[in-house]
C-alpha cells in the first residue's frame, strides 16, 4: 500500500515536470518596490543598529544637536550612518545619511514620532536610503525607551528593517503569476 502511494506520487511528479518542459518558458519580470514590502509579506525581521560609534563616522551634522548618539545601519554590503538626538528637554530626532556622503544636513527628513506605552515612550519612524544610482528604498525603524529596564540590553540600539524589495512575475499557461 505504502509502496503504491510512493509510486503514484513519484509518477505524478515526473508527469508534472515533463508537462512543464512542454510549456513555453515565460520571461520573469522584476518590479522594484521602494516601500510597503513588510505589509505585503506580513512581517519583518528587525536588525540592530548599535549606537556605539564616534561622531567621526559623519563629516557634517546639524549645529543644534544636543545629545547625539551615532551608529550604522547595514544591509548586505551597504551601510548608512545615523544619529539619534535625544535631548533631556524636547523631542528626539533621527537623522539618516541617505546618500552615504557623510553629510547629515543634505538628506531627506525622516519620520520619527514618539508613542506613549504606559510609563515609557517608544519612537517609530522611517527613512529613505539610496540603494544605487536609480533606486531608493525605505527602512522602517523603532527605538524602545532607554529608561525601560525590561529592555536594558536595547538601551543603545535602533531597531530597523528594510521595507523595500522586488516582486517577480511571469506568464504561465496564459496567466500572469
Question: What annotation goes with each model-predicted range?
Answer:
Residues 9-21:
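Bacterial N-terminal signal peptides
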Residues 24-177:
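Calcium-binding acidic motifs and repeat modules
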Residues 1-5:
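N-terminal secretory signal peptides that target proteins for export/translocation
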Amino acid at each position: 500500500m505504502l509502496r503504491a502511494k510512493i509510486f503514484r506520487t513519484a509518477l505524478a511528479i515526473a508527469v508534472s515536470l515533463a508537462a512543464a518542459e512542454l510549456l513555453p518558458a515565460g520571461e520573469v519580470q522584476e518590479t522594484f518596490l521602494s516601500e510597503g514590502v513588510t505589509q505585503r509579506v506580513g512581517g519583518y525581521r528587525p536588525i540592530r543598529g548599535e549606537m556605539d560609534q564616534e561622531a567621526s563616522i559623519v563629516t557634517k551634522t546639524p549645529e543644534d544637536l544636543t545629545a547625539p548618539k551615532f551608529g550604522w545601519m547595514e544591509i548586505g554590503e551597504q551601510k548608512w550612518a545615523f544619529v539619534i538626538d535625544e535631548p533631556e528637554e524636547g523631542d528626539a530626532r533621527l537623522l539618516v545619511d541617505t546618500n552615504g556622503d557623510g553629510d547629515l544636513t543634505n538628506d531627506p527628513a525622516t519620520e520619527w514620532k514618539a508613542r506613549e506605552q504606559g510609563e515609557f515612550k517608544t519612537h517609530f519612524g522611517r527613512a529613505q536610503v539610496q540603494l544605487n544610482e536609480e533606486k531608493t528604498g525605505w527602512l522602517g525603524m523603532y527605538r524602545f525607551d532607554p529608561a525601560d529596564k525590561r529592555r536594558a540590553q536595547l538601551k543603545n540600539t535602533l531597531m530597523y528593517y528594510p521595507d523595500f524589495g522586488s516582486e517577480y512575475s511571469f506568464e504561465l499557461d496564459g496567466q500572469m503569476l
